Amino acid sequence: MAALSFSGIASGIDTQAIIDSTVASARLARVTPNKTKLGELEETNTALETLGTKLDALRTTLQQFTSLAGGGVSKIGSSSKESVVGATATNAATNGSYDITVTSLAKNHTYSFDQTYASTTSPLESSLTGAEPAADRTVTFTIGTGANQETVSVVVTDGSYSISKFVADFNTAATKAEASIVNVGTESSPSYKVVISGTYEGTEKGTISRTALGASLASLTLFSESAASNSSLSISGIGNITRSTNSISDVIPGVTLNLASAGSATVKIAEDAATTTAKMQDFVAAYNDIVKFVSENNQITRDDSGDEVKSVFSPLATSRTDDSALQALRAQLSSSVASGGSRIRVFADIGITTERDGTIKFDSAKLQQALSSEPGSVSNLVKSFADNVAVTGGVVDRYTRYSGLLDISINNNKTLINDLNRRVSETEKQIQRMADSLKERYARLEGLMSRLQQQQNSLAGALGGGSGGS
């Protein structure tokens, strides 16, 4: 049915204005409060999601101090001769000094056909017709040994099969070696060779051997190679070591040795005060970011700018989830203790103290003093806190994981939001029905008023006519 529209001509009343005012009043009383609540809930959810992001950032900074990372103090490896051997250390490394003699380096295997070619598009074996048996046109390589072994076979199709095609087909089939074309001539007079290089050092994965050569590939019979070899070194107090790589991380716990050349050097492992301090500063910054965010979004302010004094709630003012998360972090910070420490037992002993606003203050000089006197106690203290906060099942995980405490709060709010949206929609329909009903009632009133006016005019005319005739 088309919407009724009228202007109160018969009654002289602006009925549309009355209807509009009635509708606006109904919306103000029944819709606006729900829409205001909707906005508040959506802001709360946005703030809770942001809190989750900040908690994850805190967890990332603390994961560097967990038991899984090796403890709460960073370590550094140094070498008396980096040109022979370098060293990197994880937090789990034990302080010490190691005399190392490198006898030989691990290297990969290289293999090349002795045949040279004038162009990268030159045929690999120009004498082929393609009618030969496939086995006579196939070259096969075995790469690696034992469980790490793979076999790569390339079938040369005919005399037009180029060296570039061979390289492409080999590289498609191989995972432990790579073929390439190398110019062993000059720029003006190039001379190309096909070279196959192992991608792994050492004999276990890096050995390359040509295990089959088709009878029709006579030009590929001759070859040159440089065999793969293992690294060899000796470490004082440990003995002789042979490995298939020049990066060795399974001899000294927490330490990776990077071999560079034959020779002797001394490697030392010690606390890395600078890195530990920098990581601690990152933790303090992430922790304080959470404290400030919760404080800023937990305010209830007074608004007396209008006719009535109103309380204005910040996004987290009606949520308890943020408060409980912050309380859990503070509880862990205050309860963490270094087991076995004499002078270093709590966070205040390493320069971390709590300010009146709930943020923490960091004295880096005090941390470095603690590292000099009791590095083990520092590590145990920080590790204990990090394990309780940053690992799976820890404080942060309980809030940020799927279906964790933040998810529960957000989903509860989403349920309320959906319910309020339904209420608003239904209320809008009710108000529209009320408006339509008012329009119909006023339309009937206008019709009645119009008919009464017509009757009045007719009666007045009749009375006026009768008077004139007498």
Model-derived features: positions:
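Bacterial flagellar/type III secretion structural subunits and associated motility module proteins
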Residues: 1-39, 52, 60-294, 315-430, ...
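Acidic/charged coordination and interface sites in well-structured regions
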Residues: 57
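Short, glycine/acidic-rich hinge or "gate" loops at secondary-structure transitions
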Residues: 184-187, 298-309
